[in-house]
């Protein structure tokens, strides 16, 4: 059973414009945020793993595929791990909540897509908890 959760938000539209909210998401534990600007749809960013760091992903512009795996062995993970794949879009207000112990890999569906990433660790706390794996592991990105 997956430990990843998705919090659904709301989008309100009227003649004045649009409000996207995450009223059911609580920012408890968030210490840092950053924004990824994805230049085009051919770039695959990842795999980046974090043994102790939690992450949250929210699409600000365009759309993304976010793939996640729970890593079984940080030094030599199984090539047979099954990825969980989530699609995020500016058309839907939803945030993917990733517990510690996962690796992530992302790809934009649309040129110039923008992804907000939140973390429960400061840069200093996260410095020793960054694991990199080949982007071709676990997901066939030609399908996305």
Q: Each predicted region: which residue ranges?
A:
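Non-catalytic, conserved peripheral segments adjacent to functional cores
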Residues: 1-92, 111-144
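Short beta-strand His + acidic residue motifs that chelate non-heme Fe in jelly-roll/DSBH
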Residues: 19, 96, 104-109
